[in-house]
């Protein structure tokens, strides 16, 4: 523990100011017992990390206090983390459970019953139930989500509490509306106004409270977490009197929670305001407190312990440490799509759930892609919708959250998406110059050549002398425009100082004002300079070539067909109208130059084709929709060009590459590693060591 937990706690502390903040962190508590523990904590840590204790009546009241800047932090269960998102709060630190050898930032939601009764999970109607609290993960959202199909509930606007009150004969659901639905509070035993209270003032509140409701024979089933039985019954002989209800309508011993649980749930998290939330001060408070008062350092005051008969005050007693949550992660990313879907299912009608599942949402990067996507949607006979993001990474995040379902990505971003758990669905096969057949959905993808293009008149530049010239890139993290050329240069120089390779550059997605953005021009009004979308005129393959053609740069990193697609009358835009392909040449790795038609013999690397990506559970639906759309609007589709063409753009390469012949099936390459190939994956992994990607950092946290 002494080695492990400090290492976890140190994660993300680089650059953190270790000095005590001028104003302390105000911690929100919800009961007399929590307030007492908080005051002890305050007195023990005040010399290094001043803090204050703010009392409110419920977790929701704490959320509101933090949003109103009357408090700064509170620990919440996943269901309340979701609620906090609506108040613009985000999780900043996750509780770590388990052991030093097997740490985890999740727990299992389980349904516990006593042995000797033969009912199963699908036979709970009319039983007496014990819950941790309304809107909480293990005690409400997960079990009620699973039981929804058994409820007499059509969905909003009818209250869900009303349906649950009719389903169980009696319950204790702390935080429920006992006046409107007395059955939900019938089993609770708090005195007076504390009956069914949303805090430990109600004895059956929380995990241990719900279990005691079962243990004392008040209820028939308790919805808690996997460790609750172990924490309350340390003797195996006592635990053996209980069992778990499994989703397959069987029962298993309480030790079998990994095989018999209702869901895996993200651990409790400390939340703060998304903006001006004192995140660094909160983390430093947790970091110092865990070192001094954690389980590896026995003291009179224990941060992860509760005095007397109390349980889980401020933090879960089972916590062994904290893990800093990357700044890119908001509440929805933290909770994950399966949990978000479960919560959504409790807030929608059956028809709304079905409609949401039936549609496919395509993510468009920038306004030009959105315009094309909407044209596509208006012509499509399928349930196709569009969402907008400013960057490719933001689109990936939308797909992760379920706000979008698919998009087509270059190989560099396929790597990023794959690291985040997304999968390739269909590949963009380039238009074949050897065949005009439309029967190529099953043709294996061959990729394309990443090339370095220069003006023929600029004869002094070779690959060996390219350093110090002015460069034009498609965008940061894209294959031909960034990953391949910069990877080669890193290998040659041993340096990760990208902004020193070239005298000036346009690499959309770089830090604004940096050398890597010096050549970028933004849109026609000079706005959005260096943004990684079509608002930047030098973005993408065509944009990078335009940067070269307009004499802004000396070398453009693009793909083999880019010059041919934009010269000799192929691009009628004013800037390209008079361009000729023989005015440009390719730089070869051996220091020679060749005509742009000889990319096969003069290229930097073979790059994997662009591909459509989606979530694994949505991939089959996305594939079916796209193959149907392709038959109608593809290069050989019956309604292209009369109504709409997938592979044509008013500018260039919107949604898909314009030279795509067909979206082809993957021939078994259904993971990002298989699709990209081990050589490319290794090369990108090595290049990523040169810089920190907030999205990859976030995905590493989520995939842990």
Swiss-Prot record:
Post-translational modification: Poly-N-acetyllactosaminic carbohydrate moiety seems to be needed for TLR4 activation.
Pfam families: Transferrin
Signal sequence segment: 1-19
GO cellular component: early endosome; extracellular space; plasma membrane; recycling endosome; specific granule
Keywords, alphabetical: Disulfide bond, Glycoprotein, Hydrolase, Immunity, Ion transport, Iron, Iron transport, Metal-binding, Osteogenesis, Protease, Repeat, Secreted, Serine protease, Signal, Transport
Listed InterPro entries: Lactotransferrin, Transferrin, Transferrin-like_dom, Transferrin_Fe_BS
Binding site for Fe(3+) 1: 77, 107, 207, 268
Subcellular location(s) of the protein: Secreted; Cytoplasmic granule
Location of the active site: 88, 274 (nucleophile)
Predominant location category: secreted
Every Transferrin-like domain range: 25-348, 360-689
GO biological process: antibacterial humoral response; antifungal humoral response; bone morphogenesis; innate immune response in mucosa; iron ion transport; negative regulation of apoptotic process; negative regulation of lipopolysaccharide-mediated signaling pathway; negative regulation of osteoclast development
Residues engaged in binding Fe(3+) 2: 410, 448, 541, 610
Annotated glycan sites: 385, 491
Chain positions recorded as hydrogencarbonate 1 binding sites: 132, 136, 138-139
S-S bonds: 28-62, 38-53, 130-213, 172-188, 185-196, 246-260, 363-395, 373-386, 420-699, 472-547, 496-690, 506-520, 517-530, 588-602, 640-645
Residues given in the record as hydrogencarbonate 2 binding sites: 474, 478, 480-481
Family: Belongs to the transferrin family.
Job of this protein: Transferrins are iron binding transport proteins which can bind two Fe(3+) ions in association with the binding of an anion, usually bicarbonate.
Subunit and partners: Monomer. Found in a complex with LTF, CLU, EPPIN and SEMG1. Found in a complex with MPO and LTF; interacts directly with CP, allows Fe(3+) incorporation into LTF and activation of CP ferroxidase activity.
Name of the protein: Lactotransferrin
Gene: LTF
